[in-house]
Design a protein with these regions (language model features):
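N-terminal phosphate-binding loop and adjacent alpha-helix
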Residues: 247-289, 415, 426-431, 518, ...
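A contiguous, well-structured pocket-lining segment that forms one wall/lid of small-molecule binding clefts
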Residues: 467-537
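Glycine-rich phosphate-binding loop of actin/hexokinase-like ATP-binding domains
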Residues: 219-223, 228-256, 320-335, 367, ...
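Short glycine/threonine-rich loop-to-helix capping motif typified by GTGT followed
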Residues: 306-320, 491, 539, 551-570, ...
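Nucleotide/phosphate-binding catalytic cleft detector across ATP-hydrolyzing
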Residues: 69-72, 76-218, 223, 272-273, ...
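Catalytic phosphate/nucleotide-handling subdomain of diverse soluble enzymes
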Residues: 396-398, 539-603
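Short glycine-rich phosphate-binding loop at a beta-alpha junction
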Residues: 295-306, 463, 541-551
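Iron-sulfur (Fe-S) cluster-binding segments and ferredoxin-like electron-carrier domains
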Residues: 27-31, 36, 47-97
């Protein structure tokens, strides 16, 4: 056995032990060291870079590591085997920097404005913002020698009088604390209950003097990023908000790689633990700590995610989603509880899931459609969710059609050498001077934060600016020379946005021709899906009245730059509306309102799903879209290089 030491830039270390021949990336996974590996460790992405600091590794040379970098000790973890005791540095850009949890500051109100807007819009349609949770206050008579009714019977009798319901369920967790709470409170209590037309379920019991908050948890499980809010179920107030990288990322950047991982022994449990134990539960604990709310006072949870993430969250085999005829285990489920899957809130908390529409159009898109309000407008609207599994909806109050395209993780920083989530250190906006070719950029974080990488909105800006200034051609190849443009010995070009001395990382922040090519394919998948769906309805882009854009690619997405690169159709900019993380906002609405929850089920049931792989023209559309902005320039009459 050999000792493997993983060192981090903050000075911390993790030690593990491995046998000769063990793969370094697998050793890291076993030690819960989060090294980014979007390609699931097959050497294709070049993201799992580590630096050899001591000892030896048996490493294959790769195009992702230059000869100079190799001499400095840089290796790909997935291409390295253990052969001796070894110490490696895991740089921030390759490690938990991408998946670092962030609890939002709600004091500015900017973080919660989008939830308030959605709540008001839904309420204007007549949907009531009421749910089935209530706090019931009871004053019971104390037992005597003449009144020896058991405590639980005394409680249910009082509740029955209050609610006039025959069936009242008191779970073991409440029964266990019932005798002490009743006597300490002199039989004056508050109960947190769920009331349906058929029965009542008692979640918790408190002394009547206590202030009781009924907590609710809404979670958007993205393939790359997980976001969550804790709310007051009585008022709808956002109490805490958090985001984190999905712990599953180390098993692959896309759903197919993760499904393949589940076919290995123990794979389903491993993927479920990665999203629940390593991602969601720590987010819950940190949010609860920040607002001084006990975790067991969260009594309801809503999850919105794509179909694969739904299955992996629930610990259900997703392998049948990737093979014909692409059948999921469920579209919706109402029988899941926190204790079933290990979510560390009240064990009896009911988990509702936004309903899936198809094998690759999931609950995230139905939740987002609820927020977009397409279903309540006569105008023709296009809803685009820019995520790893790019999903689209087109329609109005009379009809809606949906489809999904495998855009990959590029919009959230995956498949990009210096890509990252929209968190501290991410370049989220950029301009480039045509004459000097010098960049000016904006970085997420406090003033003075140094750049570490590029998030989705920053990538869009950089590629658009490179094209509009003539630094790259429509194929994404570098055609101008300058101090920030360089080529390696293979002839591969790159543009340096921030040199190492300007950056907050151990290497230059740059974008390469490989990165640009990956992004062109991602944007091509989205645009070709739009064209294919519209063509199937005999529509063209001129008939689109509004475009609603959602996704966690950075709040400052420049719509003109997105049009410049051919991601979005060339329509007037006033038609574009950025609605943020609509999946999370939709989950919030479903959590808060029983009627909104039912409306989401109705939307899913009435939406037509188009399977793009069965449309003969889709691949032709995709090939045409894999240029900047497109092979057919007439589709983008308003895009002109400066």
């Amino acid at each position: 056995m050999f000792k493997v030491t993983f060192a981090f830039e903050n000075g911390s270390e993790v030690e593990a032990f491995a046998n000769a021949g063990d793969n370094l990336l697998e050793v890291a996974r076993g030690a819960n060291v989060a090294i980014d590996a979007p390609c699931s460790g097959n050497g294709a992405c070049g993201k799992c870079r580590v630096q050899l600091k001591g000892g030896e590794l048996d490493s294959k040379k790769t195009l992702h590591i230059s000869d100079e970098e190799f001499e400095k000790g840089w290796r790909l973890a997935c291409m390295s085997k253990i052969c001796a005791d070894v110490e490696v540095l895991v740089p921030d850009i390759a490690s938990a920097y991408k998946s670092r949890m962030k609890v939002a500051d709600l004091s500015s109100k900017e973080e919660i404005a989008i939830f308030e807007k959605a709540k008001n819009q839904v309420e204007e349609t007549g949907i009531q913002l009421r749910n089935s949770l209530e706090v019931v206050e009871l004053q019971m008579t104390e037992p005597t020698l003449d009144d020896t009714m058991p405590d639980v019977e005394r409680l249910t009798r009082a509740l029955r009088k209050f609610m006039n319901l025959k069936r009242i369920r008191v779970p073991y967790a409440v029964l266990r604390k019932l005798p002490d709470v009743l006597r300490a409170s002199k039989f004056s209590v508050k109960c947190v209950v769920r009331v349906t037309p058929d029965d009542m379920f008692v979640y918790d019991i408190f002394d009547a003097k206590e202030d009781v908050i009924m907590g609710g948890l809404a979670v958007d499980i993205g393939t790359t990023t997980v976001s969550a809010v804790i709310i007051n179920m009585a008022t709808g107030e956002i109490l805490a908000k958090s985001s984190s990288g999905n712990g599953q990322i180390r098993y692959g950047a896309d759903v197919i790689n993760r499904i393949i991982e589940t076919t290995k022994p123990g794979g389903i449990k491993k993927l479920q633990d990665a999203v629940i134990k390593e991602t969601i539960n720590p987010m819950i604990h940190e949010m609860c700590r920040s607002i001084h709310l006990p975790e067991n006072q969260i009594y309801r949870m809503c999850v919105a995610s794509n179909t694969t993430m739904n299955h992996l969250f629930a610990g259900i085999n997703a392998d049948y989603l990737r093979t014909e005829p692409y059948i999921p285990a469920f579209f919706k489920t109402n029988s899941l509880f926190a204790s079933d899957v290990g979510i560390e809130i009240n064990g009896d908390a009911h988990i509702i899931m936004a309903p899936n529409i198809g094998s690759y159009v999931g609950g995230d898109i139905t939740a987002g459609t609820l927020v977009s309000m397409i279903w309540n407008r006569p105008e023709f609207s296009l809803f685009i969710d820019l995520g790893t599994n790019g999903e689209l909806v087109f329609g109005n109050s009379d009809f809606m059609m949906s489809c999904a395209c495998s855009a990959g993780p590029a919009f959230e920083g995956g498949d990009i050498s210096c890509g990252m989530r929209a968190t501290d250190g991410a370049i989220e906006a950029c301009t480039i001077d045509k004459e000097t070719m010098e960049p000016t950029y904006k970085v997420v974080g406090d003033p003075g934060t140094k750049p570490v990488g590029l998030c989705g909105s920053g990538i869009i800006d950089v590629i658009s600016e490179l094209f509009m200034t003539g630094i790259i051609n429509p194929k994404g190849k570098f055609v101008r020379e300058g101090k920030r443009v360089r080529h390696d010995h293979y002839g591969m070009g790159s543009y340096v946005i921030a040199f190492e001395e300007e950056a907050g990382s151990v290497k230059d922040v740059e974008i390469t021709e490989v990165d640009i090519d990956n992004f062109i394919r991602a944007k091509g998948a989205i645009f070709s899906a739009i064209r294919t769906m519209l063509s199937s309805l005999d529509f063209d882009v001129s008939m689109i009245d509004d475009v609603y854009v959602a996704g966690g690619i950075g709040s400052g997405i420049n719509m003109q730059n997105a049009v410049n690169i051919g991601l979005f159709p060339d329509v007037p900019l006033e038609k574009f509306h950025y609605i943020g993380n609509s999946s999370l906002t939709g989950a919030y609405l479903m959590l808060l309102s029983t009627q909104a929850e039912k409306k989401t089920y109705e939307l899913a049931a009435n939406m037509t799903y188009m399977e793009l792989s069965t449309v003969p023209t889709y691949m032709d559309e995709f090939v045409g879209a894999c240029f900047i902005p497109h092979t057919d320039a007439s589709m983008f009459p308003n895009v002109h290089q400066r």
